[in-house]
């Protein structure tokens, strides 16, 4: 039985057919990376901006009238979102409180250096909810760019602030924002693994699963309601689909050997998975309820890490069929419908394919002086290295395709990082204590 070509990848993915000793080695790699203190109270991610884009858009967001009556500071969240994107520069409102219904002297805000201005209000309602209103202005043209009104519960205030930031982002930059999306990731503190779901800024983290065994490879369903992942709680890798609203789980694949690397089809009806049930790891398709297993590859190599293209017509995957791991593309119906074609040619070791939401770019990890995140233009094959770290893994595109979330190591710690696809905006997201890895960026909220 063939071994996987790199122990480093084995410790991250468990996609081959490891012996019991190899599985134990993979677990020890996690243990070595973890810090041994803190608990669930420290599940929130801390964000550090390490690079920003050029030509940042200056925006002033006044304090919303009445927001002191709400348990969330909406304007603080909005300002933080805009700053963290690297695309905006917050202009200090100097403590000004302005409602969306007020007459605004836009010229004075323009004189303060703001090209856009945001005003709003938060009003408690008689049934315990909150009415949130805002308006966005173009100070240069002296005109309104529109606004929205929301009636929400206390628990919805935070996501409402993210939605306001998304509105500002789209109106001013002409592309959809991702502040109201969610992240999934795995934390490791002591001997406890947790699958966590948080807002896009790493806050408001909720525990989906806690285990004393590793959890890897979370993958969001297209509607954002379910997460597929691999759990070792049965003392072997098993693929589950987890309903986030109910907490109910379905075993999607518990075949003999390894069950790993789940990837959703764009319609949310199927998953591609990697299984070693018949020997070498190969790619299969299975229905989201665990039925209808069908083999897609039949090579003598290791075929793993499948990823559907956004149009559902192709599956990208990693294979060593050429002697070393490279990324290939085949029809979504499998190699019986057409031979797989090699996609990556720069470098001798390329793994972990992820396709941008528009299908134009491929993010992957290349071994070149370490493991580095790369971005390939699928139209011409041009490749750009996006990071200066050397332990990158698990890339995941934001829903708008403008940012990539990945795991890496900084200062000896396992952290998450995000980089814009132009390489200019960079963030590091870390836990107060413990290791964090296996990130997946969720889709636009339905």
From Swiss-Prot:
- Where is the secretion signal located? 1-43
What SUPFAM superfamilies does its record include? Answer: TolB, N-terminal domain, Tricorn protease N-terminal domain
- Could you give one GO CC term from the UniProt record? periplasmic space
Give a yes or no for keyword Cell cycle in this entry: yes
GO terms in the biological process aspect are: cell division; protein import
- Keyword terms of this UniProt record: Cell cycle, Cell division, Periplasm, Signal
Tell me the superkingdom of the source. Bacteria
Q: Where does it reside?
A: Periplasm
Q: Which Pfam families match?
A: PD40 (PF07676), TolB_N (PF04052)
Q: What is its main location?
A: periplasm
Similarity field: Belongs to the TolB family.
Quaternary assembly: The Tol-Pal system is composed of five core proteins: the inner membrane proteins TolA, TolQ and TolR, the periplasmic protein TolB and the outer membrane protein Pal. They form a network linking the inner and outer membranes and the peptidoglycan layer.
Per the entry, what this protein does is: Part of the Tol-Pal system, which plays a role in outer membrane invagination during cell division and is important for maintaining outer membrane integrity.
Q: What is this protein called?
A: Tol-Pal system protein TolB
Q: What is the lineage of its organism?
A: Bacteria, Pseudomonadati, Pseudomonadota, Betaproteobacteria, Burkholderiales
* Record gene name: tolB
């Amino acid at each position: 039985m063939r071994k996987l070509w790199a122990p480093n990848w084995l410790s991250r993915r468990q996609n081959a057919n490891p012996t019991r000793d190899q599985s134990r080695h993979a677990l020890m790699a996690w243990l070595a990376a973890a810090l041994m203190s803190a608990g669930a109270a420290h599940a929130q991610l801390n964000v550090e901006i390490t690079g920003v884009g050029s030509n940042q858009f200056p925006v002033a967001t006044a304090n919303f009238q009445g927001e002191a009556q709400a348990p969330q500071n909406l304007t603080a969240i909005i300002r933080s979102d805009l700053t963290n994107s690297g695309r905006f520069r917050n202009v200090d409102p100097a403590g000004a409180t302005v409602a969306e219904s007020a007459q605004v002297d836009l010229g004075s805000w323009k004189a303060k250096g703001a090209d856009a201005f945001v005003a709003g209000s938060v009003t408690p309602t008689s049934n315990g909810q909150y009415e949130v209103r805002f308006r966005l202005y173009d100070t240069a043209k002296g005109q309104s760019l529109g606004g929205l009104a929301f009636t929400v519960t206390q628990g919805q205030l935070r996501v409402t602030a993210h939605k306001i930031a998304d509105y500002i982002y789209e109106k001013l930059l002409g592309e959809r924002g991702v502040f109201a999306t969610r992240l999934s990731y795995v934390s490791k503190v002591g001997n406890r693994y947790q699958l966590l779901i948080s807002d896009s800024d790493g806050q408001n983290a909720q525990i989906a699963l806690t285990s004393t065994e590793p959890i890897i490879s979370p993958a969001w369903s297209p509607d954002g309601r379910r997460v597929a992942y691999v759990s070792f709680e049965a003392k072997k890798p098993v693929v589950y689909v987890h309903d986030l609203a109910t907490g109910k789980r379905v075993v999607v694949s518990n075949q003999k050997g390894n069950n790993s690397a789940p990837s959703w089809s764009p319609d949310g009806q199927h998953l591609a998975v990697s299984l070693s049930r018949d020997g070498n790891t190969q790619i299969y398709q299975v229905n989201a309820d665990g039925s209808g297993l069908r083999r897609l590859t039949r090579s003598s190599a290791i075929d793993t890490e499948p990823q559907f293209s956004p149009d559902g017509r192709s599956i990208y995957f990693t294979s060593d069929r050429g002697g070393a791991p490279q990324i290939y593309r085949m029809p979504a119906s499998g190699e019986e419908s057409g031979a797989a074609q090699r996609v990556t040619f720069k470098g001798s070791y390329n793994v972990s394919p992820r396709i941008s939401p528009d299908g134009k770019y491929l993010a992957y990890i290349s071994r070149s002086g370490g493991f580095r995140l790369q971005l390939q233009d699928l139209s011409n094959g041009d490749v750009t290295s996006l990071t200066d770290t050397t332990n990158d893994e698990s890339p995941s595109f934001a829903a708008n395709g403008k940012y990539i979330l990945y795991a890496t190591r900084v200062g000896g710690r396992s952290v998450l990082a995000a980089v814009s696809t132009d390489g200019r905006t960079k963030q590091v997201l870390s836990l107060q204590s413990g290791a964090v890895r296996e990130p997946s960026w969720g889709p636009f909220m339905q």
